Amino acid sequence: MANLLQRLRRRTGPKPDYIEDKLDEYIREEQVEETGGSNQDCPLGEIEKILDREWRPTASNNPNSSDNGTPTLVVVKQYLVKWKGLSYLHCSWVPEQEFEKAYKSHPHLKLKLRVTRFNAAMDVFIAENGAHEFIAIRPEWKTVDRIIACREGDDGEEYLVKYKELSYRNSYWESESDISDFQNEIQRFKDINSSSRRDKYVENERNREEFKQFDLTPEFLTGTLHTYQLEGLNFLRYSWSKKTNVILADEMGLGKTIQSIAFLASLFEENLSPHLVVAPLSTIRNWEREFATWAPHMNVVMYTGDSEARDVIWEHEFYFSEGRKSKFDVLLTTYEMVHPGISVLSPIKWTCMIIDEGHRLKNQKSKLYSSLSQFTSKHIVLLTGTPLQNNLNELFALMHFLDADKFGSLEKFQDINKEEQISRLHQMLAPHLLRRLKKDVLKDKVPPKKELILRVDMSSQQKEVYKAVITNNYQVLTKKRDAKISNVLMKLRQVCSHPYLLPDFEPRFEDANEAFTKLLEASGKLQLLDKMMVKLKEQGHRVLIYTQFQHTLYLLEDYFTFKNWNYERIDGKISGPERQVRIDRFNAENSNRFCFLLSTRAGGIGINLATADTVIIYDSDWNPHADLQAMARVHRLGQTNKVMIYRLIHKGTVEERMMEITKNKMLLEHLVVGKQHLCQDELDDIIKYGSKELFSEENDEAGRSGKIHYDDAAIEQLLDRNHVDAVEVSLDDEEETDFLKNFKVASFEYVDDENEAAALEEAQAIENNSSVRNADRTSHWKDLLKDKYEVQQAEELSALGKRKRNGKQVMYAEDDLDGLEEISDEEDEYCLDDLKVTSDEEEEADEPEAARQRKPRTVTRPYRKRARDNSEEIPLMEGEGRYLMVLGFNETERDIFLRTFKRYGAGNFDWKEFVNPLYMKTYDEINKYGILFLKHIAENPTDNSTNFKVITAMVYADGVPKEGISSDELLVSMTFMMLVKEKCQFLDNHPTAPVFSNYVISKYNLRNGAFSKEEHDRILIPAVSKHGYGRWVAIVEDEEIGFQEVACKDLNIPFPPDTKSARKRICDHVGKRVKKMEDAIKYEYAEKILAEQAKAETKGTSFVDAEKEMLKNDPITSKKNSATAVDNKQGRVEMAQSYDQSVNEKSGESFQTYLDIQPLNRMPRESFKPLEPINEEISTRLSVGTDHDVEMDAADNIIVLD
């Protein structure tokens, strides 16, 4: 142990992080903070992490344990530890006895706590995964990846070593003897840094050599290229010689990576470098492996990791020690690293820049596009299997990136008619694009594939929830324009995936068997998937399941865990190195992983999973190419089995209609037709699809007459692969001209065996219903939903306070509080260029790698236990941090309550307005939380000590965190909404009375506009009460109010407004008008209260007089100033001067604050008697009677002094 301690002391270099193994999911050891004592005599103080535990033999310390004097071996518990500053090569087993000694001699090290936590984490891991799944040290962590530096040590040369699967920041100095088994890596380091290699490089500005065609695979490659790959290499070489930037657009699975490496290797043979490769995070490791396979003589450096890792790379891997010549031949990096590394990467003069998945550059306004445009490169190659994904704009973005001079103006091209447009496009693209298809070049090398669309009926629960979402969004669907229609569509997509995706909709079960049964019963897709998966496993197939939603992945994990099937998972939260580990584990020989769960975007790009032979698209992507990318993970070079692809789609839902829309996107590859953005009418058309038939099932047997039934025979037919070859041949000829002909739709036996003609007639009826255009849009929803919506609203009001809602009952859609602003609804979008999906569809490039690594990774877990029984009392608080629950309200639910409160106030204290936004809560739960909320904002701290002020600034008296809530602001907001309701009642009772007095109209500039008159204010005030404060867009678009037309006239804007900016001007106009009326209403009420006080106390005459009195704060005179300076203390003079300035500048502000808080002393008391204790607190806090003075404190805040 002493020798180890000495070695630890002389070690230098970067300190490593904790290792990234699965155990980190459960344990995050706190950094030990030394509170005294020294570690120099205790090596255990140098422990970085405990890795493992075992009962192992060791020599006994008992001298009498052996007759011949040789120590007897005894088995004791030992811990495997990693030491700070040392690599995994130097981990040691330490007996538990050594730890026990340190507990007593060095308590400040907190070793007992660390050991206890480790043991607890190990117990959990083994219980959930089994001991066989635990690996303390991966072999890669002890395998030298690269040597990046050399220095002279005490015992000879030392090398700075980067180990495989570990970041550069986890590099360690090792003596040559420590890594003597890695002589090849030592020699490679010496070769890279040799003077002969430095002198070999030439400037890449020299003239390009003439094109020389390769007839055979070049000798500098260590593998053999297919004929079409050799053709691709020659295409890239030819474009280089002609100085033409290009797109290599071969279909997925044809080896674009290998062709690109061959091209860079050919340039390297001409001493041309450096080169840059930018690739997705999920494929960067594969690029490194392919370089090692095909061009191992090239120095390839991967530029990834956090800032510390990148600093190590820049210091040791970028340049030779002499001069500024690049040491690397190829730099691999990810999209995420381009922007943070721009200061390091952009100054380099690249010979060739290759961008994998180049369609990521389709948006010229993206950060990636902007950053890469700043790089200097003599040649650019984009790799993409899908160059034309959505529209002409995106294609031109790619071409503009390649050649800004040739493709400078999209407008010029769009002026050409369709036929000439297509012809000219092909002519312009010809020198820049090479695209081959698998069916053309791999007829005999890749087994055929077959895709089936499986139409599935929704479960009864899904149908109820689906209808509830539509019904509760009746007002959204019947508006001419409402950006929130995209939210409705998203909710319907979630219902189709599984109803449990909706917030807090999942029921709570303690019994795992019952939970599993309900999980299956809730989803028609999952029921079919269960039948298929059982048979696929029996037949020895391996499966990939793709979905859009991370929550769906969790539900599928629950399913697989209950089935006790081994699986892997990748989504956007899994780090790059961990992704490759999981891919390798799945692809390993004799792997026991039956299935791979993947999000379409994170797991559908550039990875090879050809060891599977079945793909299930659980829910489709808006972009059909994303699904094709996912399929290509299996159907590619290296596949030896026939491939089956199943796409699950719920019959008569938005999913089925979406398939029709994706058809247009796919046709764009052959007929460029311009913009393909989804407009309001298209979104509405998707939602309407099948809605009439769904609601017609309520009172008859029509719903059961067309139900699709998948029995055992049907499942066997689905999984039969004997006819794959015949199907594939029939599709080949037309698959590039008609997207849907790629698929064979599976419509198996109907329960009632309806004939084909009737089925076609039904399908045609659905199509006709779904194609109702904009003129009939409103009438469609009114005819279908109006009566149901009104009945539902009436039932909801009558049952308020009695109805209990849980996961099994009808769900009420959220009142769309997303993005609520206190002042304006500017966030409401009217034009939908594309649908923003809140799922795992997010682009990985938008999230830095470091940020993803900070997120907790998902691990295999047992079936999730449900929350407490309904009869159990809900505690005031449980959990902590972001998982804190207050009376059962999580962070999101508390935020919804707060924003609803700001919008409506407390209403009549019946919480009616809170029911829909908080559909996941029962009325009783809302009521209890509402009373607690009012109690909190009514608190009036009386302890003025410094410590107490600090505490009360953070928590309420009962210990609940304040979470930044301003009580005074909320009380003012609540009372104003009460005043609005009172004003509405007054206007209803006095229809001929003026809205405001002439004095108030003059004071707050509420005069009539060019067209708007007092009668418009008379309808605007009730609109605020109806829609809530700040909901200007909803107020403007409310046809019953009809304020939009007069606002257009006031602003001289065409009606109806046809641009987003015009609609924004109208909303701003309404907001400003309401703000003026708000001030006026507060003023009127304050005048009323003061008048009553004056009458009762014979003190003061009017509010106008009170205003004058408020402004009579006298400054300190110069004589008084002189008096304060008698003791020669400058601070007194400065304080007096500061007060004078405050009087002059803040008097008006003080009066406005007085206006805000003065009238609130009685409004809550008059409104809700049952809350009298809380009401008294509210009144106390807000009262500013005649016995109070209003002053400014040192921070220029209004305070009340008794």
From Swiss-Prot:
Principal location listed in the UniProt entry: nucleus
Intracellular or extracellular location(s): Nucleus
Helicase ATP-binding domain residues: 237-405
Residues covered by the Chromo domain: 45-109, 142-201
Keywords: ATP-binding, Chromatin regulator, DNA-binding, Helicase, Hydrolase, Nucleotide-binding, Nucleus, Repeat
GO cellular component: nucleus
Enzyme Commission identifier(s): 3.6.4.-
Helicase C-terminal domain: residues covered: 528-679
GO molecular function: ATP binding; DNA binding; helicase activity; hydrolase activity
Residues binding ATP, per UniProt: D250, E251, M252, G253, L254, G255, K256, T257
Region (Disordered): 838-872
CDD domains named in the record: CD1_tandem, CD2_tandem, SF2_C_SNF
Motif (DEAH box): 356-359
Record family assignment: Belongs to the SNF2/RAD54 helicase family.
Protein name, UniProt field: CHD3-type chromatin-remodeling factor CHR7
Species in which this protein is naturally found: Arabidopsis thaliana (Mouse-ear cress)
Name of the gene: CHR7
